From Swiss-Prot:
PANTHER family per record: HOMEOBOX PROTEIN RHOX5 (PTHR47465:SF6), MCG113260-RELATED-RELATED (PTHR47465)
The protein, known as: Homeobox protein Rhox5
GO MF entries: DNA binding
Annotated GO CC locations: nucleus
GN (gene name): Rhox5
Organism: Mus minutoides
Region (Disordered): 29-117
DNA-binding stretch(es), residue numbering of this chain: 117-175
Signal peptide feature range: none
Highest taxon, organism lineage: Eukaryota
Entry keyword set: Differentiation, DNA-binding, Homeobox, Nucleus
Biological process annotations from GO: cell differentiation
Localization terms from the record: Nucleus
SMART domains: HOX
């Protein structure tokens, strides 16, 4: 028992010493790794010396309204391209406006002959009617051959026939309006004699007017 306790007392300090040595080595490695990382960061920052200046200048440009070396009035290829583009766009707009102005001038100075004339359908019908009336007045009869009317009026026979039909219907309508109506015909429509009575004749069954 005494031998075992003595061996434990001997191995205990040895184990503690080994553990302390391992912890010290681990701390040394960690410090070396951190120092190496910081050195890399410093080298990267030294390799880009204008980064901070550019960042400050960019912030100043944003605060001043965005006008800097790359603005619209800056000297260089960008400013020249803007000028060229502006002149080109202005030339295209002028070319587009010139044909429109020419078109308006031509419309203003256009001849009246070029404009579309209104239709003369009513005048044409009135002219044909006057010709037909003059023909009927000279002959004083409705028995004029339709072929002569067709030849004189320069129209087809069907139109002449249709015109005569319309004129007859109009004459009958006017005659009915001017002729008197039987007295009792206004009161009743059941008189058997009035059904066969002509316009203008008096019905034999008509009652005397008081």
């Amino acid at each position: 028992m005494e031998a075992q306790s003595s061996s434990r007392q001997v191995t205990g300090p040895l184990y503690l010493g080994v553990k302390e040595d391992w912890e010290e080595q681990h701390d040394v490695k960690a410090e070396a790794f951190l120092q190496a990382g910081e050195g890399r960061k410093e080298k990267g920052a030294q390799g880009q010396p204008g980064v901070g200046a550019v960042g400050k200048e960019g912030e100043g440009e944003e605060l001043s309204g965005g006008e800097g070396q790359f603005g619209p009035g800056a000297p260089g290829p960008m400013g020249d391209e803007d000028k060229d583009g502006g002149t080109r766009a202005g030339g295209v707009e002028e070319e587009q406006n010139e044909p429109a102005a020419e078109g308006t001038e031509s419309q203003k100075n256009g001849k009246p002959e070029d404009r579309q004339m209104p239709l003369q359908g009513s005048r044409f019908a009135q002219q044909r009617l006057s010709e037909l009336q003059s023909i009927l007045q000279r002959t004083n009869s409705f028995d004029v051959p339709r072929e002569d009317l067709y030849r004189l009026m320069d129209t087809c026979v069907a139109r002449v026939q249709n015109w005569f039909k319309i004129r007859r219907a109009a004459a009958r309508r006017n005659r009915r309006r001017t002729t008197p109506v039987p007295e009792h015909f206004r009161g009743t429509f059941e008189c058997p004699a009035c059904r066969g009575v002509r316009w203008g004749e008096r019905c034999p069954f008509a009652t005397p007017r008081f």
